[in-house]
Amino acid sequence: IQFLEQQSMAKKYQLASHQQPQHISIPLQPVLFIAHLKRLFPVFNQGSISNHFPYYASTIWTDENEQQHQVMVFQYHYVNEVRVRDKNGNDVKVKEIHKDLWGVFIFDIAIQGLAVTTGNKTFDHSYRFPWHTSDIQTNQKLNIFGSDEMQTAKLLTLAFVLKLADFFEQRQGDLMFHPTRSTLCFLGPLHLFK
């Protein structure tokens, strides 16, 4: 049944399962390609044992300005190990916790150097400048960080902040625009393949 659901989804949204986006001029080995994408954003190290993409698919999306973007939708699976000390002081593995998040990479995006999260966290040095909007409700729901203070100030107009608030109205997760590459990554708990 799961296979049929995946096939139906692939046809409906023209998803190319386990395929790299077409914008990559020289296709990489899948392992190298995924490793490259995971290095671009500081959210793919959540597992102490494992961090991998068991499923991904590529397609093309058209935005509200009729511009087409290469897109890769993915499942991110990570595994954490819980360890405790026994009565003799030995480190003992108690259990493994498996978790899944789903996300999307969108390529050829004009915006760079911005990270927005619904979580109570910060990002690595790439997004080191916290930003607060003039809207108290948005500041309570979203944590915003930029890689360059001036660019962040220019980018976060009232209209853009309202778009972010609308985007996160029904979503939880992290939205990151890479500081130097024209790539966006969104990662959250909503299963995107259903």
Roles of regions detected by a PLM:
Residues 4-194:
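Charged, low-complexity intrinsically disordered regions
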